[in-house]
Curated annotation (Swiss-Prot):
Any one biological process term the GO annotation gives: rRNA base methylation
Residue numbers binding S-adenosyl-L-methionine: 219, 248, 269, 316
GO MF term set: 4 iron, 4 sulfur cluster binding; iron ion binding; rRNA (uridine-C5-)-methyltransferase activity
Binding site for [4Fe-4S] cluster: 7, 15, 18, 94
Species annotation: Shewanella sp. (strain MR-4)
Gene name tied to this protein: rlmC
Active site residues of this protein: 343
The protein's name: 23S rRNA (uracil(747)-C(5))-methyltransferase RlmC
Reaction catalysis annotation: uridine(747) in 23S rRNA + S-adenosyl-L-methionine = 5-methyluridine(747) in 23S rRNA + S-adenosyl-L-homocysteine + H(+)
Enzyme class: transferase
Pfam families the UniProt entry points to: tRNA_U5-meth_tr (PF05958)
EC code(s) of this entry: 2.1.1.189
PANTHER family: RNA M5U METHYLTRANSFERASE (PTHR11061), TRNA (URACIL(54)-C(5))-METHYLTRANSFERASE (PTHR11061:SF30)
InterPro entries the UniProt entry points to: 23SrRNA_MeTrfase_RlmC, MeTrfase_TrmA_AS, MeTrfase_TrmA_CS, SAM-dependent_MTases_sf, U5_MeTrfase_fam
Higher taxonomy: Bacteria, Pseudomonadati, Pseudomonadota, Gammaproteobacteria, Alteromonadales
Length: 384
């Protein structure tokens, strides 16, 4: 396993985001595995071989999303970050991005210059362009491009230059403007204005169609994410559940991988854009017994849903975990199994302490975030 030892940004002290980039991948994985095993040790029954080998992908060129701060001036824009020393650093050559994405990021710097859009200055509360957000679909190499602006003032300039950009890069399928008028370092605002007829980007993992809209969460490492979803599919299939819940379902990645035409699936996600994407996928797959609803997962589990208990429950919460209340609800529902996908092993361990009547039978680490402290964990809990 290789590592990104030649990252110039890191060597020059301009970007420290990949804090472990100087360590061999094997050493990075060993540290992550040790942390996971220590956190989950209280829940491990030595009678069962819970920890499976970690799943890894490429150490460079794997990331499908760029969040670039707009810096510099209208005549000399910089897309990247502010370095620890306060320098505006272009990150267009970041090695986490595929080569075609790097090239497009450079082109977007020229686009901003040609359009004459002044980057927003937080210290002076002046300027227009705050961020550029670029998302890449691996299935066709297509892109969604978002401009985060302070106001509507620069939209006409973007529209003026956009035809030339899209003629040069026909793989750009979705373009939008997000309005973020607040004088704070907030990534995006409430209002999204589409500049293209298309409003979603298509992705495909393991023959499952998935869709990305501007505000819907999507995994940033598609290579390893596809393996994560496939593993979930295989683990769930072992139980042949007659009904499924997918809580914190996002665009439906887990549930749609585990669904079948004769199995009722209920997916719950608070973000309405993600639910719209999940419904579209289910329709394409011909899944008539699937329902996706934009609700809070904890509230859903406490409501009328408690009358129809599923045989298997999938949870994929944000970093805060599912919380004590939902843990108690899951314990009361008593499904055959609970499949927990976590991006924070600390809150996973905390939640496991609140789920009663289950044993941990499988745990697998998925390294979606090389060179960082973060990783994804898939944990299978089986009813005692």
């Amino acid at each position: 396993m290789s590592t990104l030892v030649q990252c110039g940004y890191f060597e020059r002290g301009q970007c420290q985001s990949c804090r472990h980039i100087k360590l061999p991948m094997a050493q990075q994985l060993a540290a992550k595995t040790q942390e996971l095993q220590q956190l989950l040790a209280p829940f491990v029954d030595n009678a069962e071989p819970q920890f499976l080998p970690p799943v890894v992908g490429d150490s460079s060129g794997f990331r499908n999303k760029a969040k670039m701060v707009a810096l510099g001036a209208a005549h000399a824009p910089v897309l990247g970050i502010v370095s620890p020393s306060g320098e505006a650093v272009s990150l267009c050559d970041c090695l986490l991005y595929p080569a075609d994405m790097q090239a497009l990021l450079h082109r977007l710097e020229r686009f901003v210059q040609q359009a004459g859009i002044p980057p927003y200055r937080v210290d002076k509360a002046k300027g227009e362009l705050k961020f550029i957000l670029l998302t890449r679909s691996q299935v066709r190499g297509e892109y969604m491009l978002r401009f985060v602006l302070r106001s509507r003032d620069a939209i006409a300039r973007i529209e003026r230059e956009l035809p030339a950009l899209m003629a040069e890069y026909p793989q750009i399928k979705v373009v939008s403007v997000n309005l973020q008028p607040v004088h704070m370092a907030i990534l995006e605002g409430e209002e999204e204005i589409f500049l293209t007829e298309n409003t979603r980007l298509e992705e495909r993992f393991n023959d499952v169609p998935l869709f990305i809209r501007p505000k819907s969460f999507f995994q940033t490492n598609p290579q390893v994410a596809a393996k994560l979803y496939q593993t979930a599919r295989e683990w769930v299939a072992d139980f042949a559940p007659a009904s499924l819940w997918d809580l914190f379902c996002g665009v439906g990645g887990f549930g749609l991988h585990c669904a079948a035409k004769d199995i009722p699936l209920t997916g719950i996600e608070i973000e309405a854009e993600a639910i719209a994407c999940a419904k579209m996928s289910a329709q394409l797959m011909g899944l008539d017994k699937v329902q996706f609803m934009a609700l809070d997962s904890t509230d859903f589990a406490k409501g009328d849903a408690a009358q129809t208990k599923p045989e298997l429950i999938i949870v994929n919460p944000p970093r805060r975990g599912i919380g004590e209340s939902l843990c108690h609800s899951l314990s009361e529902f008593a499904p055959k199994a609970i499949l927990y996908s976590s991006c924070n092993p600390k809150t996973l361990a905390k939640d496991l302490g609140h789920i009663r009547g289950y044993r941990l039978t499988k745990v697998q680490l998925f390294d979606l975030f090389p060179h960082s402290d973060h990783f994804e964990v898939l944990a299978l809990l089986v009813k005692d």
